[in-house]
């Protein structure tokens, strides 16, 4: 990908997702006319955040850096309280903006801060991880973790723009690329099988941040999410398909005290959801096994602790998709044919979990 590509997210109001390299100039244009901008960044991105601050300052914008903790440790209420305090101290107003710089966790907490400060100000996401690029930055879902569960406190708040700078992927460790691939695989199974074909053709090429395959996978995954979000901005029905594999994944993350990477948990969750669909008579054997084969080829986990099901069941009952104590899962009725499974029998859940239980 040599020239920037723009994917329009047709929400109300709409916003662009710009995919390319060297997008600092685009950030300046997106924020043109703002008086103050707060740049929320994770510790390892201080140098990049300072470059953004300098660039915006040269354009006459009063820009400030706010450092937040890395990963899921940053998605907590005390961190949001700290952000609010700094926003108040530097005088960020309703016509100003926040820039989020970092992975999915930074995007989530910065988005929540933007949604709640002065009842909502603009935010521009600059995701620096693969997971952030294809999942957290697009769609307007924000949230923090509490003792009650992952992302149960949050808001819908669409960004003003998303800038995906592909050059940032080249400095990421391989395990970060691998983890982000789980959400791309999910997009392939629920809506765009070409994604799966591309990965199967050459898994190593799919993981190469300097090659041509990964940028196209990112673009396709963003298009899938953009189309679903535009059709169902507030997750009333269709958007639930984006939670394919996530019911078990969130339970695993909670059991692991958020020390597992989100992509790793989603990978196990995808295989579980596929097995659940198969055992319910809704998904064929070949597509079920294809989940396991593709995820394994990318180096993602497809099994979890055999004795964990009771704890995971307790967490899943607290999942935001649960209604009146009835568990609801996204399953497939075929490739790119997502559906819903409500209130499955506990024996069916146990049988599906047995297929991902680690020996």
UniProtKB/Swiss-Prot annotation:
UniProt-annotated binding residues for Zn(2+): 183, 246, 262
Cofactor binding note: Binds 1 divalent metal cation per subunit. Can use either Co(2+) or Zn(2+).
Ligand binding (NAD(+)): 70-75, 104-108, 128-129, 141, 150
EC number: 4.2.3.4
Molecular function via GO: 3-dehydroquinate synthase activity; metal ion binding; nucleotide binding
UniProt keywords, alphabetically: Amino-acid biosynthesis, Aromatic amino acid biosynthesis, Cobalt, Cytoplasm, Lyase, Metal-binding, NAD, Nucleotide-binding, Zinc
GO cellular component terms attached to this protein's record: cytoplasm
One GO BP annotation of this record: amino acid biosynthetic process
Pfam families: DHQ_synthase, DHQS_C
Cellular localization per UniProt: Cytoplasm
Pathway participation: Metabolic intermediate biosynthesis; chorismate biosynthesis; chorismate from D-erythrose 4-phosphate and phosphoenolpyruvate: step 2/7
Reaction catalysed by this enzyme: 7-phospho-2-dehydro-3-deoxy-D-arabino-heptonate = 3-dehydroquinate + phosphate
Function: Catalyzes the conversion of 3-deoxy-D-arabino-heptulosonate 7-phosphate (DAHP) to dehydroquinate (DHQ).
Family membership noted in the UniProt record: Belongs to the sugar phosphate cyclases superfamily. Dehydroquinate synthase family.
NCBIfam families, per the entry: aroB
Protein name according to UniProt: 3-dehydroquinate synthase
Organism: Mycolicibacterium gilvum (strain PYR-GCK)
Name of the coding gene: aroB
């Amino acid at each position: 990908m040599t020239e920037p590509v723009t994917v329009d997210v047709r929400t109300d109001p709409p916003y662009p997702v710009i995919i390319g390299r060297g997008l600092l100039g685009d950030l300046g244009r997106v924020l043109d006319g703002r008086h103050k901008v707060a740049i929320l960044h994770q510790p390892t991105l201080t140098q990049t955040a300072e470059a953004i601050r300098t660039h915006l300052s040269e354009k006459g914008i009063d820009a400030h850096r706010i450092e937040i903790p890395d990963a899921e440790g940053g998605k907590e209420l005390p961190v949001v309280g700290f952000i609010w305090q700094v926003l108040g101290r530097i005088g960020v107003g309703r016509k100003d903006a926040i820039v989020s710089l970092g992975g999915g966790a930074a995007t989530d907490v910065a988005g929540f801060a933007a949604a709640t400060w002065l009842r909502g100000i603009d935010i521009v996401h600059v995701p620096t991880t693969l997971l952030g690029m294809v999942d957290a930055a697009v769609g307007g879902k924000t949230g923090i973790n509490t003792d009650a569960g992952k992302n149960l406190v949050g808001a819908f708040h669409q960004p003003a723009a998303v800038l995906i700078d592909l050059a940032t992927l080249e400095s990421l460790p391989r395990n970060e690329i691998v983890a982000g691939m789980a959400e791309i695989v999910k997009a392939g199974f629920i809506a765009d099988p070409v994604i799966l074909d591309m990965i199967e053709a050459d898994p190593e090429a799919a993981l190469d941040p300097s090659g041509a395959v990964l940028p196209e996978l990112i673009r396709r995954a963003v298009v899938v999410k953009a189309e679903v979000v535009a059709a169902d901005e507030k997750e009333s029905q269709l958007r639930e398909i984006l939670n394919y594999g996530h019911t078990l994944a969130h339970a695993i993350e909670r059991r692991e005290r958020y020390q597992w990477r989100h992509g790793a948990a989603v990978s196990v969750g995808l295989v579980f959801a596929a097995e659940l669909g198969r055992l319910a008579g809704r998904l064929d054997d070949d597509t079920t096994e294809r989940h396991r084969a593709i995820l394994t080829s990318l180096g993602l986990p497809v099994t979890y602790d055999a004795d964990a099901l009771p704890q995971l069941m307790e967490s899943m009952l607290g999942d935001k998709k649960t209604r009146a104590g009835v568990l609801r899962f996204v399953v497939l009725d075929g490739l790119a044919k997502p559906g819903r499974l409500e209130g499955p029998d506990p024996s069916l859940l146990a049988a599906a979990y047995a297929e991902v239980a680690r020996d």
